[in-house]
Amino acid sequence: MSGGSQVHIFWGAPIAPLKITVSEDTASLMSVADPWKKIQLLYSQHSLYLKDEKQHKNLENYKVPESIGSPDLSGHFLANCMNRHVHVKDDFVRSVSETQNIESQKIHSSRLSDITSSNMQICGFKSTVPHFTEEEKYQKLLSENKIRDEQPKHQPDICGKNFNTNLFQLGHKCAAVLDLVCSTEKINIGPEVVQRECVPTEYHEIQNQCLGLFSSNAVDKSRSEAAVRKVSDLKISTDTEFLSIITSSQVAFLAQKKDKRRSPVNKGNVNMETEPKASYGEIRIPEENSIQLDGFTEAYESGQNQAYSLELFSPVCPKTENSRIHINSDKGLEEHTGSQELFSSEDELPPNEIRIELCSSGILCSQLNTFHKSAIKRSCTSEDKVGQSEALSRVLQVAKKMKLISNGGDSAVEMDRRNVSEFKSIKKTSLIKNCDSKSQKYNCLVMVLSPCHVKEINIKFGPNSGSKVPLATVTVIDQSETKKKVFLWRTAAFWAFTVFLGDIILLTDVVIHEDQWIGETVLQSTFSSQLLNLGSYSSIQPEEYSSVVSEVVLQDLLAYVSSKHSYLRDLPPRQPQRVNSIDFVELEHLQPDVLVHAVLRVVDFTILTEAVYSYRGQKQKKVMLTVEQAQDQHYALVLWGPGAAWYPQLQRKKGVVLIKAQISELAFPITASQKIALNAHSSLKSIFSSLPNIVYTGCAKCGLELETDENRIYKQCFSCLPFTMKKIYYRPALMTAIDGRHDVCIRVESKLIEKILLNISADCLNRVIVPSSEITYGMVVADLFHSLLAVSAEPCVLKIQSLFVLDENSYPLQQDFSLLDFYPDIVKHGANARL
């Protein structure tokens, strides 16, 4: 120990009591005789020792008394990091003088304090000091194994750095913040959860294992700036971003289906397939399901019972460029017509895919494969290891292509039965602490402590150098009180979007992997791994899953979670959305991971030429719109997949909009110099007498107005010959719509004039409504015109298309508005757009 580094730690003497609750044993911290005290410790690779003759104790031997404070938090808290960007991880230990005892401190606060900086880092209170992690080495915070920390009297130390002490209990507000951890939409604020451990008392740790996916931004900036940063600050490939958003939206649909039915019939499967290429992202709908789930065969397992580091880091095949997402909406999804436009049809499905689907037991994430059908046989001999990378390139043709497939009717029921039957054989699960053999696959029933965003690993060596592999990290725990990270590779990384804090999940065919860089043992997925999300622990009934896992094991896990992680009961339940009840919202009220409708005004558009992703076998550029609802409150809207085709229609010079306005005049041009104008001053009698002049006789096929010869015989429409039928039409009109002080002239075609007049055809104006009545349809039409143009008439909802002709300076030379539809019932459609 004499050759170890010396660590000098200085403590200040605070004048006022700290804003935390401590026991009486630590009262000496509040006031000391001397302003400073000094203690010298010796540091080795594994522990700290007091350099004191009276107490040559290892800090590992310190006892931590029972903590007092919030019963539902048990030492967990979120801290607000100050302006200093501090990285402190699990290997930090809080030291005290030889005259003081370490007391567990539980923090009380009624609310979440304002976040001055979102650069929150993990800070742990441990009783042991493991060697430093790779991240800390990079940060050089503890580069020379020497810490000299001197604090002023008014800055108490919590994690060795300046952390605010305004902490809060884990209630509904905390749950809302924790949702930021597991949502793909929260990319501006990256709070990582502060971790704390008390030994030997119970401990609870909530970690955010995000691997630096998103950049941090202050939250005191405007929402419009945050929306722009959300799109521009992503540090993942556009392919991964595209697939992440599509996956998240489909998981929202699956969650509402699970909550609605809780039945084994799967009508909304989300199937994902990846193939080994960094660019992946194509969306299609298959006509029928031709996929078989056969990932548990012995032939496949015989070739996979080895460490997977080579397979994980030899990920790509240059010939495969796309990843497709397959979705076939069921009847429920068909009601939501807008979402159907995101997907197209495809007859054939590749045999290898990763699927996310709804089954009777929960949301199942699985991988289809044909490894067992391949003639390639691999062994662990040294000769085969030389050519293993080339063999993997041939075998792993489909390791990174993503699909979402929705099966209908009988095929869905049959597929779900196959899923359940496969899980019936997974009765034997292993505790995390018993997963110690690298040559064996394990099935683990665990609880999710912290999901993570998907990040990407750059391949820097080998033939696939320069490519990227998706990776997500999920921290789990089970009744053995062993916490472990689970690495989800390639398409399995997108499973992270299906799990949330407190979910009970079943992981199959995971293996042990030792990270040689940081000396940590983790679980990681294989090509045959599956994930079954049983749901939140508070809503699980063990008897419902007796056919999937051991009921006794599940009960033990639930009992452990209930006793050791009781704070999860305070998390608000996730409310699944209904497909037929998606609401129109204002942008300022947007919530993460919620599907919404919105009426927006396009302010500007941007095509990001460098942000390219694969869609339908082609490279597609990322299109970003700047939109607003209120004046000068801008938000960013990204058009993904087929939505990018809307871009030409959303340019500033033309577009479609709904307006609510009152019709003040209808002008029917008869000749170049003659027109009939109907307005609020027109009497009912004058309108009725004008009806013969606002109709014309035209070709029944094309609507062209037919001229007459000297004998008053209509000439033929030569373009429609031999078709010679005639029909009476309303003349096109020029409508003037007003909204307060603004007015606009709108062109109205003949068909829409007929729709405005309750679909009364122009060729029946002289007909009586009933034989015994003298009231004709012409009288009804005149009364409709009179009511529509009256001063007291109610506003109507008009769907108009605008077309502007601009000069080189974007000055409008010509503007033209055409009526596309007419909605007299403004309550039903609820349009709020203005002129």
From Swiss-Prot:
Mediates interaction with SHLD1: annotated segments: 652-822
Record region (Sufficient for interaction with SHLD3 and MAD2L2): 1-60
Keyword field contains DNA repair: yes
Alphabetically ordered keywords of this record: Chromosome, DNA damage, DNA repair, Nucleus
Compartment(s) where it occurs, according to its Swiss-Prot or TrEMBL record: Nucleus; Chromosome
GO cellular component: actin cytoskeleton; chromatin; chromosome; nucleoplasm; nucleus; site of double-strand break
Annotated segments matching region Interaction with ASTE1: 1-568
Pfam families: OB_SHLD2_2nd, SHLD2_C, SHLD2_OB1
Major subcellular site: nucleus
Entries under InterPro entries matching the protein: FAM35A (IPR029715), SHLD2_C (IPR031589), SHLD2_OB1 (IPR049507), SHLD2_OB2 (IPR053944)
GO biological process: DNA repair; negative regulation of double-strand break repair via homologous recombination; positive regulation of double-strand break repair via nonhomologous end joining; positive regulation of isotype switching; regulation of double-strand break repair via homologous recombination; somatic diversification of immunoglobulins involved in immune response; telomere maintenance in response to DNA damage
Keyword Transmembrane helix: no
Family: Belongs to the SHLD2 family.
Summary of the function given for this chain in its UniProt record: Component of the shieldin complex, which plays an important role in repair of DNA double-stranded breaks (DSBs). During G1 and S phase of the cell cycle, the complex functions downstream of TP53BP1 to promote non-homologous end joining (NHEJ) and suppress DNA end resection. Mediates various NHEJ-dependent processes including immunoglobulin class-switch recombination, and fusion of unprotected telomeres.
Additional facts recorded: In BRCA1-deficient cells, function of the shieldin complex is necessary for sensitivity to camptothecin and the PARP inhibitor olaparib.
Subunit structure: Component of the shieldin complex, consisting of SHLD1, SHLD2, SHLD3 and MAD2L2/REV7. Within the complex, SHLD2 forms a scaffold which interacts with a SHLD3-MAD2L2 subcomplex via its N-terminus, and with SHLD1 via its C-terminus. Interacts with TP53BP1. Interacts with RIF1. Interacts with ASTE1.
Name recorded for this polypeptide: Shieldin complex subunit 2
Gene: SHLD2
